[in-house]
């Protein structure tokens, strides 16, 4: 009897959904090595492997069988995805074209390391980023440069604006996945894209106000307010939008700081001065990587510092997602300072969820950890922090928390996928 790789769901599913991996037709207690690999849009190779032992019936189910070593160990049904590592050092795992799925190659080989034996069976699994029925619309409205993702069905739907960090450009993968959960989601570019500025001399909230108005005027978006989701600098822009703009019903910050960091944040006649930084505080770590966690100037006066975003002006609830091993900046300290500022002004504490062993780039579920990569502005490879297993678990939970938060405060229904064999 020949070995067979069984995947559930077979063929394809969304990246943020689990896939159940099993092997049948092995010899009783046969030792095997499972390998996973994929290439991103730039051809960069990512790989993971793990060693397993079949049961007495010659079957192997990754939901029941612990990995005996390799890229990970223990009971990790999705380990072959979250443990993927780039062949090229410090290469960040990203999805740039959500219309084309990633193709994961799965192989089962006889025996264990150092050199597994012959190939027993193999399969492909497509991991896509455009959920069934989700509609993708390019947006060029006034100054707004974005992509809108609409869920299947007649609508209208609760709306979210999704903003990324200092890398600029237009990243759509989080917005497209959110649309699969019933949210009309606008992936918004704000610099280094088409005719937008190539750098950030200052952050003008009037541009982001245009995006809010666009969403609320869209017939498929349900008002009266919208949600905001941002990571890193994008999170600080979202916190600023919540503080100054109308019709923001709920805000999620992923490893934001609540501070105007490197450049002023302006809205009409108001301006938040930048806190600033000192590159002399860069630390050189292993392999020539640099650690920038302490380059920002001290937050003198704590929550009263003039570079703090006036988050007490926000009308809707706030969720702060925090990686406790974030090496971009001191996210946990900043989250506590935001909370202190809100309480000092008689406002409710924000919801803060802290994840140990978790770095800066908290992505949708099953994204591999990016422990270090090239920093766009510094042009150096910097440490982002995180430990693979803890970071992966944090991403799974954070995604659930974000969906639940927006469902509660914007309206909507959650969808879950539980694969069964």
Swiss-Prot record:
Organism: Homo sapiens (Human)
Enzyme class of the recorded protein, top EC level: hydrolase
Protein name: Peroxisomal succinyl-coenzyme A thioesterase
Gene Ontology biological process terms in this record: acyl-CoA metabolic process; dicarboxylic acid catabolic process; dicarboxylic acid metabolic process; fatty acid biosynthetic process; fatty acid metabolic process; long-chain fatty acid metabolic process; saturated monocarboxylic acid metabolic process; short-chain fatty acid metabolic process
Motif annotated as Microbody targeting signal, chain positions: 419-421
Top-level division of the source organism's lineage: Eukaryota
InterPro entries the UniProt entry points to: AB_hydrolase_fold (IPR029058), Acyl-CoA_thioEstase_long-chain (IPR016662), BAAT_C (IPR014940), Thio_Ohase/aa_AcTrfase (IPR006862), Thio_Ohase/BAAT_N (IPR042490)
Recorded metabolic or biological pathway in which this protein acts: Lipid metabolism; fatty acid biosynthesis
Family as reported in the entry's similarity comment: Belongs to the C/M/P thioester hydrolase family.
Places the protein is found: Peroxisome
One matching Pfam family: Bile_Hydr_Trans
Gene that this polypeptide is encoded by: ACOT4
Further details from the record: Compared to mouse peroxisomal succinyl-coenzyme A thioesterase/ACOT4, the human enzyme has a broad substrate specificity overlapping the activity of three mouse acyl-coenzyme A thioesterases, providing an explanation for the unexpectedly low number of acyl-coenzyme A thioesterase genes in the human genome.
Tissue: Strongest expression in liver and kidney and weaker expression in placenta, heart, and muscle.
Classification of source organism: Eukaryota, Metazoa, Chordata, Craniata, Vertebrata
Catalytic center residues: 232 (charge relay system), 326 (charge relay system), 360 (charge relay system)
GO MF, any single term: carboxylic ester hydrolase activity
An annotated GO cellular component: peroxisome
General function of this protein: Catalyzes the hydrolysis of acyl-CoAs into free fatty acids and coenzyme A (CoASH), regulating their respective intracellular levels. Functions as a peroxisomal succinyl-coenzyme A thioesterase that can also hydrolyze glutaryl-CoA and long chain saturated acyl-CoAs.
Chain positions with N6-succinyllysine modification: 313
